[in-house]
Amino acid sequence: MIENVKGLLLAANGWFKDEIVQTIEKLGYAVNFKILNAADFGVPQSRERAIFICSRYGKISLPEPTISERTTVRDAIEDLAYLESGEGSFEQNYITEPKSEYQKLMRKNSKRLYNHQASNHKQVAIEKLKLIPPEQGKEFLPEELHGKQKFKTTWGRLKWDAVSPTIDTRFDASSNGTNNHPFLNRAITPREAARIQSFDDVFVFVGSKVYVRKQVGNAVPPLLAKAIADRIAEHFGLNREENQR
């Protein structure tokens, strides 16, 4: 399987896509490809990616959406402690019960909560966020506070009852994009980002701050990966239970 940004299929009028397909077919593989949105597979995030599945045993179709109603940011993170900038610790107790089926799924087999630590933002960033109402964006900032970032999505807050925009490797920077908490004056924590990526809470991320951001932000969302794996298993006549083993 190959995963990349959706623009790969159209870049250079499709030249890169054609080169990939032709090269892999010369190796004896049948190739199928499609743009999949992780939000269609239970991930609380709009994340469109080009997916290639390659097989020596016939062309494998890509999965169809597995849900009828999308998982929201509220579904994903509302049960997590409402930390302010600089608060939290690497390991802590849960302080509330799960409030959605998704939260129950994320907490399955997890006794403790990890990686829920808020960035220690500079005071100037916190003051900017205080000017932005819940679930809104930089349009509420005075022009002189817009900074050098030209994109409209910078300084944006997530919306509780919608899917998140695509999580990237700078999700903990308040100015980076629409990755600030819906109403708290901070960017999302690594655990909140992991939940939005569909990593359940038994995944513990270790290493430097930069390395943790890369682990979370560059990953294929596990629920999307599972849907693809289930489709491959079905192609080979395996049921889901066998696939999970």
Go through the PLM ranges and name each one.
Residues E101-R245:
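C-terminal target-recognition/interaction regions appended to catalytic cores
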